[in-house]
């Protein structure tokens, strides 16, 4: 949801979804197959290497921001038409996060998205680049 949901603490930029106590996981017993992977030193090393490769290229902060800007440019006038037809900016529509009420313009929404993604990636850098 990239920070735009009011459940399972999706507005948080830190933490893994599967570790959220409100989320029961894939298995009614609480064990998920990927938890076993996270106990494997070989897997963790491969994960770290892969993360660092992507962060140095297509998942760098600059590349992600450019991708967001590219999407905005591609959408062009459709953005304005969308909010003329559905004037929802500044409204909390489930499952939007509660902070949506403070974002009253499209620029506010884009700024929030960029900020949220950047903060999320910084947290992921800390935990995946050990």
Language-model regions, residue ranges each:
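Middle-to-C-terminal accessory/interaction subdomains
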Residues: 1-130
């Amino acid at each position: 949801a990239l920070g735009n949901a009011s459940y399972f603490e999706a507005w948080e930029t830190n933490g893994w979804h599967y570790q959220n106590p409100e989320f029961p996981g894939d298995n009614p017993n609480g064990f998920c197959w990927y938890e076993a992977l996270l106990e494997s030193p070989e897997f963790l090393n491969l994960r770290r290497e892969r993360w660092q490769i992507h962060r140095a290229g297509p998942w760098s902060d600059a590349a992600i921001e450019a991708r967001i800007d590219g999407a905005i440019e591609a959408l062009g006038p459709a953005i304005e038409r969308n909010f003329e037809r559905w004037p929802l900016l500044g409204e909390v529509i489930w499952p939007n996060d509660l902070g949506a009420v403070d974002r009253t313009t499209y620029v506010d929404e884009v700024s929030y998205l960029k900020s949220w993604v950047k903060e999320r990636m910084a947290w992921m850098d800390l935990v995946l680049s050990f």
